[in-house]
Amino acid sequence: MNINKPLEILGHVSWLWASSPLHRNWPVSLFAINVLPAIRANQYVLLTRDNYPVAYCSWANLSLENEIKYLNDVTSLVAEDWTSGDRKWFIDWIAPFGDNGALYKYMRKKFPDELFLAIRVDPKTHVGKVSEFHGGKIDKHLANKIFKQYHHELITEVKNKTDFQFFINRLRGN
């Protein structure tokens, strides 16, 4: 459910950030970078139960160029980047009260024909990896084929970047 009051949304999302073991120690500057553009672009979902927030997800629709920028530095996105293309990236996925499954089902239903990528961070090692997600109506084999093309386009572009820091083998699943 999207709530139409931006300050109320910010309060709900900040509550979820503070309740998340991964997010609670992140600086306020990351909250501003990750949350404000999502609310402005209406690229978020906030699940509530009994008027209390239980899960939040935001996504950016990136161009290939901004996707590379994001992979190189996850704090680099500016407001305009969030609506720069058609390559969907989950920016935040927060479900600190056990509602991860509900959020997953909601997103697969909301975006039945869409593909998403995400950087998932291991809470113990703080190492990130790129993960793939697809809507509920997309055939898994077709999704894999499209993701393979996405990765090919990405790797081709990254090879031309001399200042890129992300480890390419992670994109290939090695």
From Swiss-Prot:
Activity control, per UniProt: The acyltransferase activity is inhibited by heme.
Entry annotated with the keyword Cytoplasm: yes
GO biological process: killing of cells of another organism; toxin metabolic process
Keyword Acyltransferase attributed: yes
Binding-site residues, heme: 151
Keywords tagged on the record: Acyltransferase, Cytolysis, Cytoplasm, Heme, Hemolysis, Iron, Metal-binding, Transferase, Virulence
Entry comment on modification after translation: Proteolytically cleaved by the protease systems ClpAP, ClpXP and FtsH, leading to its degradation.
Protein EC: 2.3.1.-
GO cellular component: cytoplasm
UniProt main location, coarse: cytoplasm
Classification via InterPro entries: RTX_toxin-activating_protC_bac
GO molecular function term, any single one: metal ion binding
Chemical reaction(s) catalysed: tetradecanoyl-[ACP] + L-lysyl-[protein] = N(6)-tetradecanoyl-L-lysyl-[protein] + holo-[ACP] + H(+)
Membrane-crossing residue ranges in chain numbering: none
Cell location: Cytoplasm
Known partners and oligomeric status: Monomer.
Record function comment: Protein-lysine myristoyltransferase that catalyzes myristoylation of the protoxin (HlyA) at two internal lysine residues, thereby converting it to the active toxin.
Protein name in the entry: Protein-lysine myristoyltransferase HlyC
Organism expressing this protein natively: Escherichia coli
The encoding gene: hlyC
